[in-house]
Amino acid sequence: MLKRTGQSWRVLLLLGAMAWLPTAVLAEPARWNVDPEHSTIEFRVTHMVVSKTTGRFMDYAGFVDMDAEAGTVKAIEATIKTGSVNTNHEKRDAHLRSADFLDVEHYPTITFKMKSYKKTAEGYTAVGDLTLRGVTKEITLVGQYNGATKDPWGNTRAGFSAEGKLNRKDFGMVWNKTLDSGGLVVGDEVQIRLDIECIKAKS
């Protein structure tokens, strides 16, 4: 009887350990907040066929929920203030804020919410919903997770880079003018470049 009881206890302990094991292995993702002082949200668009114009958004916030050790991401969300657009040209920036383009009076923010994340041999692919001028479209970001490190002030930081593209006409930005050569002043495709640094939230 004692021997059988001892065996039963060993079985119960083994089952308990097996039930606990997945929880121990699959760590809960941590919240990492975007540090705008060390991040860049940049876009490029063809200008008059022969060159590119580059701009940035200066006011934004966001977060990444991830397990940094495993490099797995559960969520990415971001909000960008459209009025913060900056192409280093005041007149052009005013035009971009107008109803011809971003229409900041009626649509003060751009939002992104991740739907799926896949690790690849080259880095990762993140697919999500981008909402701009009241229109929501799916876009794909392809990039790299650059790892995590401690800064001199005790914060843990992680870095991401990514690129994507969209067609501005999909979001109602159809303004253009035709050149004498037959080309257009502004290209339809907008290239996106992100360099994002995040700080791990204190637990």
Question: Can you say where each PLM-predicted feature lies in the sequence?
Answer:
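Bacterial N-terminal signal peptides that target proteins for export
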Residues: 2-13
